[in-house]
From Swiss-Prot:
Its main location: mitochondrion. GO terms for cellular component: mitochondrion; ribonucleoprotein complex; ribosome. Belongs to the bacterial ribosomal protein bS1 family. It is found in: Mitochondrion. Residues 218-250 are annotated as: Disordered. The keyword Mitochondrion applies. Keywords: Mitochondrion, Ribonucleoprotein, Ribosomal protein. Disulfide bonds: none annotated. This is Small ribosomal subunit protein bS1m. Transmembrane segments: none annotated.
Length: 270
């Protein structure tokens, strides 16, 4: 018989463990977790809320349903310290997911270094990713406590994407009023700028007014536009006629009369 025919027969001799119940004992008790000896290759970490129906003591024995057996590798990895570290990381991940789903989505951390497309941020033992577009200011504060908000979490690859909110000096975690929340989220600099804007009176730079000719050059510029409107009185018309004639004769003497013939024609017609 070939290997492909013998292999399924060999596996069929083993009883499948998934879905079955075995007798277990507690090895170690801690604040929120229990180290359980299943009699298999490795012990299993259980949380207290999973074992509420059974009294949690060192002498307790109970039936435990197998879902997934996790192998750590070499026997050295079965020491309690690596197991504690892994359990703590699981508890921290649960707390971070609670913060991410809550209304007050704020976490403290600091920027480690720059990576491709952004920065690496250390948050509670996890390394999160901060894109450059979500950085609050151009100046990067390395190894300083900053406030971040969690945008996305992927438990399969332990990926966390964050956004920078501000520095760690302001108490962002204290309950605030609705009109104060926006200023605190944006940071201390923007709040200071808004207070300065309220206290200062902004003056208008531009004031629109009618143009009044005051010099000879401005008077000549207005006369090129043509005669005055008909609303003026006869005395004003006479003064304008005399002034335009005098200006035309002066310009003719200077050799610029050809370009200003239309002014003389207008004065003759009037």
């Amino acid at each position: 018989m070939s290997f492909s025919q013998l292999f399924p027969k060999y596996n069929s001799s083993f009883n499948p463990l998934r879905g079955s119940a075995i007798q277990c004992s507690v090895i170690q008790l801690q604040q929120n977790k229990v180290l359980v000896d299943t009699g298999l290759k490795t012990p299993i970490i259980c949380f207290q809320h999973e074992l509420k129906r059974v009294p949690i003591t060192k002498q307790a024995r109970f039936h435990f349903g197998i879902e997934d057996v996790e192998v750590f590798g070499e026997p050295k990895m079965l020491l309690p310290k690596p197991l504690e570290i892994k359990c703590k990381r699981k508890l921290v991940w649960i707390e971070l997911t609670k913060i991410w789903r809550s209304d007050q989505n704020l976490v403290k951390g600091f920027i480690l270094n720059s990576v491709k497309g952004g920065y690496a941020v250390a948050i509670a033992g996890y390394i999160a990713f901060l894109p450059k577009s979500l950085l609050r200011s151009r100046k990067v504060f390395y190894s300083q406590w900053r406030i971040f908000s969690i945008l996305n979490m992927k438990p399969k690859i332990s990926n966390i994407v964050v956004k920078e909110i501000g520095d760690g000096k302001i108490d962002y975690f204290s309950p605030t009023k609705s009109h104060q929340k926006q200023t605190k989220y944006l940071g201390a600099k923007l709040k200071h700028w808004r207070n300065m804007k309220k206290n200062t009176n902004v003056k208008k730079k531009y004031i629109f007014s009618e143009k009044v000719p005051t010099t000879k050059k401005t008077k000549q510029g207005f006369k090129h536009l043509g005669p005055k409107p008909l609303a003026y009185t006869e005395k004003k018309r006479e003064t304008t006629k005399q002034s335009t004639k005098n200006n035309v004769f002066q310009l003719k003497d200077q050799g610029q009369g050809k370009s200003l013939v239309f002014v003389d024609v207008l004065t003759q017609s009037s």
